Amino acid sequence: MFGTVFRILDEKNRIVMPPAFRNELEGDFYISANLEKILEIRSQTEFDLLAQKIGKANSLDPKLRDFARYFFGNTVKVSADKQGRFLIPKNLLDLATISKNLYLIGVNNKIEIWPEQRYEQFYAKFSDSEMTADLEKELLKSGVEL
């Protein structure tokens, strides 16, 4: 998935999923909070793959157990209605500090949900030519040429 879409929550904490993203998700999907306190949307298939990997992690490691609690405790299964609207639970909105305005960002196999101000601060970094030059070097080291 790719692309960036601005959305405004309605009075019931719902937004409309863009059609391109909706087509990729195919049915019910999951909203989770990541460690950066950004919300992530995954299809059933992608969520199952990630849940399986987390389940295979060493359950004797207290840090990994804590992560599993955090991740699964901050995940909900969601369905869109016929208009493509879906509810983002208040606890997840609060965790991500989303009040009204937000961005949906397609990031490969998931969609991130960012609060407006935080996304705009993040995006502004890419106007720094020194930062982008450093990033390009790192990408080349990883075998990614733009």
From Swiss-Prot:
Superkingdom field: Bacteria
InterPro entries this protein is in? MraZ, MraZ_C, MraZ_dom, MraZ_N, MraZ_sf, SpoVT-AbrB_dom, SpoVT-AbrB_sf
Which of UniProt's keywords are assigned here?
Answer: Cytoplasm, DNA-binding, Repeat, Transcription, Transcription regulation
GO molecular function terms attached to this record = DNA-binding transcription factor activity; transcription cis-regulatory region binding
Q: Which CDD domains match?
A: MraZ_C (cd16321), MraZ_N (cd16320)
- Tell me if Cytoplasm is a UniProt keyword of this record: yes
Record bears the keyword RNA-binding:
no
**Cellular-component GO terms for this entry:** cytoplasm; nucleoid
Domain SpoVT-AbrB per the UniProt entry, residue ranges: 4-46, 75-118
Q: Pfam families under this entry?
A: MraZ
A single GO BP: negative regulation of DNA-templated transcription initiation
Gene3D superfamilies the UniProt entry points to: Transcriptional regulator MraZ domain
Question: Where is it predominantly found?
Answer: cytoplasm
Q: Where in the cell is it found?
A: Cytoplasm, Nucleoid
Quaternary structure, per UniProt, is:
Forms oligomers.
The record's listing under PANTHER family reads: TRANSCRIPTIONAL REGULATOR MRAZ
Give the matching HAMAP family: MraZ (MF_01008)
Would you identify the family this protein belongs to, as annotated?
A: Belongs to the MraZ family.
Q: What is this protein called?
A: Transcriptional regulator MraZ
